[in-house]
Amino acid sequence: MTDVATQTADILINGIPFSEFIKNNTIESDISDWDFLKDNSDTERDTDGDNDNENENESNNVDVCTNISPSLSEQDVQGLRESILYCIDESVRNNPLSFSDPTFHIKLENSIYEVIEYTFSDNSFTSIDIFAFTEEMENQIEEVITTCLEEYFETIVPPRSYPTTCILQPPNVAETVKKIEYLKSIPQDEQRTAGWYIFRNKLITASAAWKVFKSESCINQLIYEKCKPLAANITANSDDVDDIEREKDKEQIIVEKTFVNTNSPLHWGQKYEKLSVMLYEARNNTKVGEFGCIKHPKYDFLGASPDGINVDPVSPLYGRMLEIKNVFNREITGIPIEEYWIQTQLQMQVCDCDECDFLETCFKEYEDEAAFIHDSSSDIDAEFHLTSAKTLKGVIAYFMKDGKPFYEYAPLYLTREEYDRWCEEIIDKNAGITWLKNIYWYLNQYSCVLIRKNDIWFESAIKKIENVWNTILKERETGYEHRAPKKRTPKKKNNIPYEENTNESGCLIVISDLELNI
């Protein structure tokens, strides 16, 4: 049978710890009805009360095992199935927040096996143990458990995620049109603009809400970030300055303070986000629309900025949300990590989307154009866009505009002739700004999995989020300084004159810490 070594101590059933449940609420109530446990041993046991002979006891045990049916009858299977479905449902509904755990399904399955093992090894209510099962019976039990889990997560509650993206059913076009039109009608600032930062500061956003479900330290950090002023040097008092004017002051300061470290993982993700959208649209023959920061229609302290939503009415993906993560150095497993799973769930709730494609991409960059051109699958011009490993490659033109990075993305699947022409045309198109270089990329990994909206999880999660938000509102008035991170004593640095320190690295062009704090 499946290894049950995975810890299940954090699972509750009927509101009590799992370890207590399997002692007091196992499936023993159904055991008397299962034919494969009827060993007829009552007629074979010593009725004279003389059970001191060890050989007789061993003989009885052998008789019990030999009288076990070699397989489960249909009645046995049905009884087992009903009990397992009950255990699954109780576990899920008593542990809804556990869905965010990437090992959720493994823990749940192992807990079911543990119930079975404990039930049939407890001699207080059955005369056999699990090790007396035949191989055929073990296979039957394993098949029943697997089938029950599949049926439950197909019909009752959606699984945490699917192994890949897929179409479960065609979209309701009429209903989806109304949803998208409503989202478009909501006033919203473009992502990463000053107004966008200001609006997000008034909310707990989907991308930061994961901290609510982590340690006290993470919760403390979130409260501190939301309490402190958006820009440190804004000191305007609400009694002295009109609200609208104060918002304008904030916006101006934000614009002035927005610096972008082009070497950071954050900027890497932003740089390749549009390219990931292009790939997704091309692979799925769809169109992705952009949206700003949107507030939940009921819970006004919760907001989300989805990377996009499929807006092509003829696409089978119409209305499906898209969340993108451009991996810098993390392994892509196809299983969304906890922080990202929570983010997608909250985004779907805010935008009333039932499904989300969670896309992870990993791009690598060539050293120069020569390496880019050399890495080709063949000399055929039509395959110029393919690497020697048959993966996609392309080019991004990197400009500087108003002191900030600006990128132009070459169309996908270019021939060599089209590539040469695009490189010339893009320079002419942006003649008024500074061209820095071309970035030559290739696709190293592409993973897209489907995540469905989980209302059971959200019903429990929103209560915890609201509690933290109430604390934020309170401490904005009463004081939050006690939550400030403790300052570490800086290490002693060498006293090297600035003129002589010529080994500084990195390109700090123009991002403040605002995005990381919101």
Language-model segments: which ranges?
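Accessory terminal regions of nucleic-acid processing enzymes
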Residues: 1-518
